Amino acid sequence: MCIRDSLSKVGIDTTYVGVSANCPSGVALINVDASGENSIAVASGANADLLPADIDAAEEAIASASLIIMQLETPVETVAHAARIARKHGVKVILNPAPAPREPLPASLLADVDIIIPNKTEAELISGVEITDSDSELRAINAIHAMGVPTVIFTLGSKGALICENGDCELIPSFKVAPVDTTAAGDTFCGALCVALSEDMPMRRAIEFANKAASITVTRMGAQQSIPTRDEVDF
């Protein structure tokens, strides 16, 4: 209940947040090193209980959305089902493939994705290409394009994000800050990007907006409490 309360306090609709009778909420244990980089151990908990039937119950909400964003912290078959529902209603589908998939993602899922936002590890696992330099980055991105995903936003940490679509790639540099904790940086980037795209910002501007939000997050300790407000990000 405390998780739902914390979401409600910041104006997030929790109508479709259910309660599992089988297990506790998912937990992530995060270790942060002296440079601010982190390593994360995850216990999925109730995340694993999200079923395609739960998506069906929320179909009306999905159909009325401008976009849907998903990760891989819930069962892949549920993610794929949500993508199909969104596609049926003409809703943009965005996938942040985190945690990095241990098994190949279903071709049917990737075919329903409009925008994918992987980091280096995730891009390697999805594409099957070892990334060692800029040339191998492009090979990995092209392999993902070939799987049916038209837009790839390859996040590069402190370097920024590489946006590739329609055969062209552009690096959108990050804002330079002194990081203390990179926890929630990727989630903040994805959330801010979705806000920007839902407001019809051009892609480059949307990524700049997301980069700024993430750059603020890494200057603070913690996860939810490190995420900036809209007033802090607007520029």
Stretches with model-predicted labels:
Residues 3-66, 84, 233-235:
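Conserved N-terminal subdomain of the carbohydrate kinase-like
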Residues 8, 87, 145:
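Anion (oxyanion) recognition and catalysis
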Residues 41, 125-128, 217:
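Residues that scaffold the ATP/ADP-binding catalytic core of kinase and kinase-like folds
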Residues 45-47, 98-100, 121-123, 175-178:
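Short, acidic/turn-prone active-site loops that include or flank metal/cofactor-
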Residues 66-139, 158-161:
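Conserved beta-alpha-beta core of the PfkB/ribokinase-like small-molecule kinase fold
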Residues 102-103, 107, 111, 134-235:
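Conserved phosphate-binding/catalytic region of the ribokinase-like
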